[in-house]
Each structure stands twice: as C-alpha cells, then as structure tokens.
UniProtKB/Swiss-Prot annotation:
Domain of life (superkingdom): Bacteria
Lipidation (N-palmitoyl cysteine): C25
Record keyword Cell division present: no
Chief location category: membrane
Protein's UniProt name: Uncharacterized lipoprotein SAB0040
Family annotation (Pfam families): DUF576
Membrane topology type: Lipid-anchor
Cleavable signal peptide: 1-24
Family: Belongs to the staphylococcal tandem lipoprotein family.
GO cellular component, one term: plasma membrane
The keyword 4Fe-4S is annotated on this UniProt entry: no
Positions in coiled-coil regions: none
Length: 256
C-alpha cells in the first residue's frame, strides 16, 4: 500500500514538473516574440515620418556597406460585410534613407466573393510621394474622393502606441523554428488605446473587440529577410472579414 502511495506521489510530482517545464518554455517563447517586435513597435508613434530617415533599424550582411536601407511603411483596412465583396484600402511608402526620397502608392481593391465562381481582385494604384511629411499624388487624379482619402491618410505608425505591449499576457503562441514562422495573438478590449484610434479613423461595422496578431518570419533575433506584421482582427469567418494590417520594415535599397 505504501509503495503504491509513493508511486502515486512520484507520478503526480513528475506530471507537475512536465507541466511547469512546458509552461515555462511557452512563456519564454512568448517573451521572445514580444521582444522581437518591441524593437520596432517601441518607435511608435512617429508623427513625422521624415524622422525615419534618421532611424537605423536592423541591418545584417544583406546590406551593402554604403546602403543605409529603405524603410517600407504599410497600412491597410480590409472590410468584407457578411456575404459581400471585400473592400481594401491602404498605402505603401518606400523611404530611401541614402537619398532621403520617397515613392509609393495608395491602393483601392475590391476582392469579389468566391461564390461568384472566380476569385478576382480589382486593385487600382495611385502613385504617391511624401513632401514635408505630407502624402501627395504624383499623377493627376480625377476622382475627388480618392484625392481626399490620400490627403487625409495616416499610417498606423503615426498614431499607434505599444507602450503597454509588455502587459499583454497569455497569448496564443505559435512557433515553427524550421521555417521559421512565429506569431502571438491577444484578445483586446474596445477600451484599448489602439482600438479606439482605429475606430476613430475608420468606419468599422462591428462592435466586436479585435484580436491583436503579431506575426513574422525569419530569425527572431533580427533579419532583413522575412517580415513582421501586426494585424487587428475584428471579424474572421467565412463570408465576413474585418481586419487592419500594418508593418514597418527596413530592407536593402536595391530596386526600390
């Protein structure tokens, strides 16, 4: 009887040990992922985008020694009401540090429903550049609505704030070291600062609080190969999707 009790105690102890080790590893990877993103997210907000010309970012052997790199700034909102087409609006800006010049485009896309028999998007691009921290079209635009949208556009990096990133806990963590691919997902509330900012700027047709997804590829400690994206997912299901995407990344300048 005593032997059975001892075996049971040992078994329970080993079980708790395994659970503790597994939990510890998960928490460790979560902190690694957050720390990897924090290098970039700690720069938010950058109200004057021209300040990026003086920010070095992560560099590795993919950069030529004389190349300061190009910052790539992206923000977009995608809205697909239930059973309808998806409407996407966003902007991409390339900021070349060596020449302190920019080029990019504002885009509008309508992605048709798959139940129409074909998957087709209808992206239209409007080339832009930045002058004195203002985005301006480089070609004539007849559509006054599009002109106004470009004039009023702000990248998320200009108003987002992740000072509370370290407070996000118990995320849904995914990590594949072979690819490598990694992500951390957190449920937010509508009282979250960044959620309030998005609702202030976009007509988001749902009261649901979003999930924040930090997703990336490449070495967790830093790499110019791969990407790091953030996404606020308000709705994600078949036939209905609402999400906001953003990224800020330094890459070698060739072909920009």
């Amino acid at each position: 009887m005593i032997k059975r009790v001892n075996k049971l105690v040992i078994g329970i102890s080993l079980l708790f040990l395994v659970i503790s080790i597994t939990a510890g590893c998960g928490m460790g990877k979560e902190e690694e992922i957050k720390k990897s993103f924090e290098k970039t997210l700690s720069m938010y907000p950058i109200k004057n985008l021209e300040d990026l010309y003086d920010k070095k970012g992560y560099r590795d052997d993919q950069f030529d020694k004389n190349d300061k790199g190009t910052w790539i700034v992206r923000s977009s909102m995608s809205i697909q009401p239930n059973g309808k087409d998806m409407n996407v609006k966003g902007m991409v800006l390339y900021m070349i540090r060596n020449t302190r010049t920019t080029n990019g485009y504002y885009y509008v896309d309508v992605i048709e429903r798959e139940d129409k028999g074909i998957h087709r998007d209808n992206e239209k691009r409007y080339p832009v550049k930045m002058v004195d921290n203002k985005i301006i079209p480089t070609k004539e635009i007849e559509d006054e609505k599009i002109k106004k949208e470009i004039e009023n556009f702000k990248f998320f990096v200009q108003y987002g704030n992740f000072k509370d990133l370290s407070k996000y806990k118990d995320g849904d963590i995914s990590y594949n070291p072979e690819a490598p691919i990694y992500s951390a997902k957190y449920q937010l509330t509508n009282n979250d600062y960044n959620v309030k900012q998005l609702r202030k700027r976009y007509n988001i047709p749902t009261n649901k609080a979003p999930k924040l997804l930090l997703k990336g590829t490449g070495n967790l400690k830093g790499s110019s190969v791969g990407y790091k994206d953030i996404e606020f997912t308000f709705v994600e299901k078949k036939g209905e999707n609402i999400y906001f995407s953003d990224s800020l990344h330094l890459e070698p300048s060739e072909d920009k």
